[in-house]
């Protein structure tokens, strides 16, 4: 209601979904759901059928195939997840020096985890930067807080000298340049 031009999306592995829950999410204001299928085509087909049974339109959902081979990068663009992939099975080393490029991700979106923590970036799996608590604070207060604004300004000026950005290999300029202009 308060942000009619805001697009609300959710990313999930689909485990907790059923038709009733899907419909409730969309009734509550969700615009699109992106569901990652990791276990093969059968899994993807089941998720597709689930969305159809909930009467979702093709514009309301995307089932993302994440089960491809290692040679196909598993169907995803791999990153070091802000330095957390060094100890993973598929090691991607942390950067020794921060990228000297802007990152616009916090200028056009934020991420809400299942506990209500508002994160600046989907790559901050270690939750190094928590912008606020959605259970206790209003979205706009978190979005326009000193902390959020300061981080956006730093990253928009190619300054990644803060955790976890200093070890992150994500380009961060794929989208959001126009939005970044509002925060400089």
Question: Locations of the language-model features?
Answer:
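Short clusters of hydrophobic/aromatic residues that line enzyme substrate/ligand-binding pockets
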Residues: 17, 103, 131-134
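Flexible mid-to-C-terminal extensions adjoining Fe-S/redox cofactors in radical SAM and related proteins
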Residues: 123-184
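Distinct, well-ordered alpha-helical segments
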Residues: 19-25
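A C-terminal junction/extension of Radical SAM enzymes
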Residues: 48-121, 160-175, 180
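Core AdoMet radical
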Residues: 5-17, 30-67
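A general structural motif
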Residues: 5-7, 27-32, 100, 107, ...
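Conserved, mostly hydrophobic/aromatic
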Residues: 10, 116, 139
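N-terminal active-site wall of soluble small-molecule enzyme domains
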Residues: 1-2
């Amino acid at each position: 209601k308060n942000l009619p031009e805001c697009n609300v999306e959710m990313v999930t592995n689909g485990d907790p979904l059923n038709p009733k829950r899907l419909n409730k999410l969309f009734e509550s204001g969700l615009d699109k759901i992106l569901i990652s299928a990791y276990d093969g085509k059968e899994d993807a087909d089941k998720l597709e059928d689930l969305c159809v049974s909930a009467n979702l339109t093709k514009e309301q959902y995307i089932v993302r195939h994440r089960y491809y081979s290692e040679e196909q990068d598993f169907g995803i663009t791999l990153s070091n997840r802000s330095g957390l992939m060094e100890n993973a099975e598929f090691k991607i080393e942390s950067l020794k020096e921060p990228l000297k490029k802007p990152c616009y991700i916090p200028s056009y979106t934020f991420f809400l985890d299942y506990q209500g923590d508002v994160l600046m970036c989907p790559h901050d799996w270690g939750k190094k930067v928590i912008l606020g608590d959605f259970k206790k604070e209003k979205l706009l207060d978190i979005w326009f807080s000193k902390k959020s604004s300061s981080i956006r300004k730093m990253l928009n000026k190619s300054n990644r000298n803060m955790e976890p950005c200093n070890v992150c290999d994500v380009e961060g300029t794929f989208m959001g340049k126009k939005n970044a202009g509002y925060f400089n």
